[in-house]
Amino acid sequence: LGDVYKRQGMISVETYVNDQMVATYHGDGLIVSTPTGSTAYSLSVGGPVVAPQCACLVLSPVAPHNLTMRPVVIPSSSDVRLKVHARHAEISIATDNETCPIPEGAEFRVRLASRRFFLAVPHNISFYDTLRKKMMWGVDIRS
């Protein structure tokens, strides 16, 4: 999964989970990520690192204009509905390397696909080994 973002100017993203209003995010955008995507763009905007075994999605605001807006973790079975508004911004939606402009007021849904894919991972390397090695997780840099 990817993100909704602006090219210039501020956008507002009305966000509903299972038809319940969560919040209207005002800022540069909103990232909806899976556990696999949690260590990418979502992490860089302050989202949590999520273990791949967790059945969840993460909603991470990008440069929110309200300091109380924080990432939220929701069940992976959730139906996320987003409605995007912008006064003076060009709005795009991006998933992986594909970017598509969307019109003001566009509404769309995000949910897990019914199909799954399997990632080949060596049995002798755990998720936590990878965190420590690639992200220097818990490494003491004081020396």
Q: What is the predicted role of each segment?
A:
Residues Q8, D28, S44, A120, ...:
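Generic signature of intrinsically disordered, low-complexity segments enriched in small/polar residues
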Residues V17-M21, R70-S143:
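ATP/nucleoside-binding phosphotransfer catalytic cores, i.e., glycine-rich phosphate-binding loops
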Residues T24-G27, V32-T68:
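Gly/Ser/Thr-rich active-site loops/lids in small-molecule metabolic enzymes
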